[in-house]
């Protein structure tokens, strides 16, 4: 027996430890009283747990309205606009029947309208909304009450923002109320292809059902394509086309269908002015639009030629985010008026662009631009994920890390023994023998322990892959890796703002999402391949992890 170097009997030492532990339990200090109605934030400020921390965002409405609440009067011919406005503001939902009623009644009105609308001033023209319902309410504050103000919307009511169905239902309800003073055009996002790729289809299924989505798809095919305002301005979502010579070309389109990927209907929804519009080095009227992956860029010369031929003053369009909410392009030689104007009505687009939004008010031959900023809104995790689904990979990764850390705990003596067994020149491990296959043999049990440790390591790496997927922001993908810097999503809007500091940064980051997206089958295939590669990489890293190999070897031989 080894001596304990004069430190006394080991038994007495352990007895003293036990006595101390018992004494600590018997004379336990009383726990301090905690007021659970008060929570201290990271910055030291205190908030009440009995109230909402974000008072700018109202508590959600937990009920679905009765027909008495939904309809304006007993005739049941018009929805109650004021009720819907407040109900949607509180994230309230309608019954399936009520939502379908709004969409179908709106569809009847849209179907009866021509491809090319004609309206007189005064009117307020609005650009992209993109599911930003709370900013849409601000738009009506700035632009005027729809009961007293004439409105023309240029499309893109859905996708990217997480309140698209509320935007559709509210705008369609306004159309039912004011069919002759509120007009809705089609944007490139009002189609099956983009709504399936981005968020609108998922949103409809999450908040309502696929039947609501299908009703919206039918309704989108009924939206008019263009408008001539005050016999002076062509209003469209995208831009010009090599196939657009006169306004009759628009009137002759068969619009009741999914937009094609080329041709006049495609170009009206997808085309853009050249980036160096007005200072082009090319003499071509149209250049392939490599940014969108379809349609064209049109030149200053193309715009001037079209305006002169059709006796128009300017083209008013949407389709492109603008830092100031609008952009005036080079003036025409004949009228001195901007040949093209872009209006964008979604402020702080995607919660990261930091842009202003704008509407264009035209009255008494005077054109005014009204700008406005974003409004606080409820937060949704990407793809309408619930917090448990989103956070499980984080929890799983930490638990496996903790398990490995616990198993890695060892004394210096054990480490010395392990390094001795793995010293250079040591013999290679023996090949499995018949005895090693016996479940009762020591070798078999050791190998089983080793495999379990390695499996935990692989599991840890897999959770890491899943955690990285949870951090992926599906709407914003950086050019260099498909995701924002790790952790920015957990930091919420502030973290993303730090990662993307300017409008131009955000625009560059988001550029690939402005393209015509791949088909659903291609997306599924790419996602499956990415996941398989990530999991294969995770397994390979775990198998080559020296710390794990050392740990498994030490535990299996102890």
Curated annotation (Swiss-Prot):
Protein name: Serine/threonine-protein phosphatase 2B catalytic subunit
Cysteine disulfide partners in this protein: none
Entry function: Calcium-dependent, calmodulin-stimulated protein phosphatase. This subunit may have a role in the calmodulin activation of calcineurin.
Organism: Neurospora crassa (strain ATCC 24698 / 74-OR23-1A / CBS 708.71 / DSM 1257 / FGSC 987)
Entry note: cofactor: Binds 1 Fe(3+) ion per subunit.
SUPFAM superfamilies documented for this protein: Metallo-dependent phosphatases (SSF56300)
Binding site residues for Fe cation: 128, 130, 156
Enzyme class per UniProt: hydrolase
